[in-house]
UniProtKB/Swiss-Prot annotation:
InterPro entries in alphabetical order: Ribosomal_uL6-like, Ribosomal_uL6-like_a/b-dom_sf, Ribosomal_uL6_a/b-dom, Ribosomal_uL6_bac-type, Ribosomal_uL6_CS
Entry's family note: Belongs to the universal ribosomal protein uL6 family.
Protein's UniProt keywords contain RNA-binding: yes
NCBIfam families for this protein: L6_bact
Subunit structure of this chain's protein: Part of the 50S ribosomal subunit.
Name of the protein this chain belongs to: Large ribosomal subunit protein uL6
Length: 179
């Protein structure tokens, strides 16, 4: 049996979870999220916890068992506390500015890069080199952070570029001058 899938999910007091057909809707103080549940698993709910069960022990059913449990857990955490990703910009003259729902990046290209931040993601700029993305959907927050990082990945020689706040950039030694 899936070790992750068989654990019950505790529902915080301010979060409600309801099932409509094959969709699960989780609502809390920060908003609400909905996801489609595959027919391979069954979700059993009561007032304080959610339990995910599977119909058979086939390989596919076992894989969905843990996946669905984790997706529901991420939805509950998102609507109760939310998710946050921090990015750092490293480089002389590199900076970020917020212009409404757009992020303007000045990162060494001939013109500034404008990135449109999707709905459901909150953008906060601390100093000019720290970007904080937050939202209730873990997948969406991570995807937006990865797209922003992809604009200028940190390079290994000087470490310039956009990196996650906790990311360690492996540095390489540059060319040595001939003797």
């Amino acid at each position: 049996m899936s070790r992750i899938g068989k654990k019950p999910i505790e529902l915080p007091a301010n979060v409600t979870c309801e099932r409509t057909g094959n969709a699960i809707k989780v609502a809390g103080p920060r908003g609400e999220l909905t996801t489609i549940i595959p027919e391979k698993v069954e979700v059993v709910m009561d007032q304080t916890k959610v339990l995910v069960k599977r119909h058979s022990d086939s390989r596919e059913d076992r894989s969905y068992h843990g996946l669905v449990r984790t997706l529901i857990q991420n939805m509950i955490t998102g609507v109760s506390t939310g998710y946050e990703k921090s990015l750092e910009i490293v480089g002389v003259g590199f900076k970020a500015e917020a212009e409404g729902r757009n992020l303007k990046l000045t990162i060494g290209y001939s013109s500034p890069i404008i990135y449109a931040v999707p709905e459901g993601i909150d953008l906060k700029i601390e100093k000019a080199t720290n970007i904080i993305l937050s939202g209730i959907d873990k997948e969406k927050v991570g995807k937006v952070a990865a797209e922003i990082r992809r604009i200028k990945k940190p390079e290994p020689y000087k470490g310039k570029g956009i990196k996650y706040a906790n990311e360690q950039v492996r540095r390489k030694v540059g060319k040595s001058v001939g003797a």
